[in-house]
Amino acid sequence: LTAIRRLMLESNGLVTIAFRRSLIKQGTGKPISDIGEEEYDLSNKWLTSPYCQIEPAMAFQLGLPVLILREKGVIAEGILEVLPDGYGFLKGVLGVYMPEFDLNCNLDDYFKSKEWIQIIQKWEGYVRKVVDNKGKPPMLY
């Protein structure tokens, strides 16, 4: 983790791509939960690399802009979880929209889409702000 943190300190932002990595053929989430939560089926769902959880959390703690893309089928849990924002959109737990992509679709079309252009321009703006603010004294409030 020290090496990752060192790289983060030298960075101005982070892009994480949560690709499908490990397939759960048959599984159950929260089986026999003692806190009253319902169990759910995890069969034929995908896990991604644990670094897709670790690195965005570290970047967030350092105040870096984080953009996460999640491949369709990857379990949306932890930092990859999406929640309704009250306006009909789903946002990630970091408070920004988290796009889901499908490798079976034409990605060139997605990268030309209005959705992608808005997302990447917004993230780029956050990164530019980090670059502008580096070297300035920290502000507590």
Enumerate the language-model features and the residues they cover.
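TIR-domain catalytic/interaction hotspot
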Residues: L1-F60
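Short hydrophobic alpha-helical runs that function as membrane-insertion/retention elements
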Residues: V15-I17, P65-R70
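Conserved nucleotide-binding/hydrolysis micro-motifs of P-loop NTPases
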Residues: S22, G73-I75
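Catalytic cores of processing enzymes, dominated by hydrolases/peptidases
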Residues: P56, L64, E71-G73
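C-terminal interaction surface of TIR/SEFIR-family domains
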Residues: A76-Y141
